[in-house]
Amino acid sequence: MEELGAIMSSSFDPVLSARSIERFAPRTTDVVIAPFGKCGTTWTQQIFHTLRTKGDMNFDDISRVVPWIETSGSLGLDINAEQKACPRGFKSHLSYDKVPKGCRYINVIRNPIDAAYSSFKFMEGWYIEPGTVSADEFVLQNAKKGEYHRHFVSWWPHRNDENVLYLVYEHMKQDITSTIKKIAAFIEIALDQDLLEITKKHSSFSFMTEHEDRFDDAMLRNQSEAGVLPKGSDSSKVRVGKVGEYDLGEEVIAALNVKWQEIVMPVTGFGSYKELIASRAHPNEG
């Protein structure tokens, strides 16, 4: 686990990241897709890009056309460049207090246990050699940091802000049509039946799996492989994303629940994620 931090620092240089954020010149029309990691960011990027381009797939990496603000400097991208279509769109995993202000924002929340397990599956084979770190060890170590929970509570007070679209991952899985309609309305894209069907198709698991080379962080992976990671490492972002199918021990789940009680409950008033999303009108309303 100590080696993991050293490896990841080769891809996520804090100095370059801070410089990238400082250089970003936001516009009021910009859309920043800002969930915590493994909470539907890539999926939402694809929905957004499909809507604004009516189905463009002429890109090698979704984060080239909807760039990740924090890594733009290390990847040599001009974060302030014009994009293929309007509105401009960006990815970020920053908490609300750190994200550049003056834009529109899409935040997606997801069950912290599912998100934590998905993070392990994503890291295994890319940043972690398979078999060297267990899911329990990885998730428990990260649970102690409380990063998911602090990100969650930073966005929660802004869930009803006019310039924030606050979505629930589990509701997206259950009703993608409603999700697409809400995103289209939020980014002010006229949505007819043809565009709705194209967007449903292009954001489906089968389509994104068929084109997974566009969603595997190719730019970031190539930079990592040039440093310390083995060639051919697996960084696919396209996973089924099933709800409640994590394989974690009771101790790990308990640790995540404790963090929720410590950090999230005092801010939201909800004792669990399940209780919180039950309060959110479904699907993706309210």
Where are the language model's segments positioned?
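PAPS-dependent sulfotransferase catalytic domain
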Residues: 1-167, 229-286
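PAPS/PAP-binding and catalytic site of the sulfotransferase fold
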Residues: 42-54, 166-191, 207, 232
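Helix N-cap / loop-to-helix initiation motif
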Residues: 191-192, 249
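Conserved ATP-dependent motor core of P-loop NTPases, especially the RecA-like helicase ATPase domain
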Residues: 198-199
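Short acidic/His-enriched helical or mixed secondary-structure segments at domain edges of catalytic enzymes
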Residues: 202-232
